[in-house]
Amino acid sequence: MPRTYSEEFLLEMYRADPNRTGVALAHACVKANLPAKYVAQTLKVSRMTVYSWFRGKPIRDKNRQLAEVFTDLVEGDIVKGLLPAKNLIDAKRYLEDMIGEPLKN
């Protein structure tokens, strides 16, 4: 089952450079209430990779553009009022609709 973001993680995120792609991704996911587990499945990487990006670690070129587009889509849907997700079921459903395939629990 996906976990919520810890206070320690949130403090680290707010201290990190918001201009880094992964940190911007983290801000969007936290605002949208999208769990890292489901974000990782959506981006086809491990949960640990997503957390690494969230903390500002480098993103390989092959994944950078995907992370940027994902961030833009999520931020746009926040503005439109489609996000934040009210619960885990809504978060999962939102991401499944985005990629057109089911995510694992």
Predicted regions and their residues:
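N-terminal interaction modules that seed assembly of large macromolecular complexes
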Residues: 33-34, 51
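Short, charged recognition helix plus adjacent turn
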Residues: 2, 78-105
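A short, Lys/Arg-rich alpha-helix, primarily the initiator
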Residues: 2-32
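Recognition helix of helix-turn-helix/homeodomain-like DNA-binding domains
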Residues: 44-60
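Short alpha-helical "recognition helix" segments of helix-turn-helix
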Residues: 38-40
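Charge-rich, solvent-exposed alpha-helical interaction surfaces
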Residues: 28, 69, 73, 90-98
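DNA major-groove recognition helix of helix-turn-helix/homeodomain DNA-binding modules
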Residues: 62-80
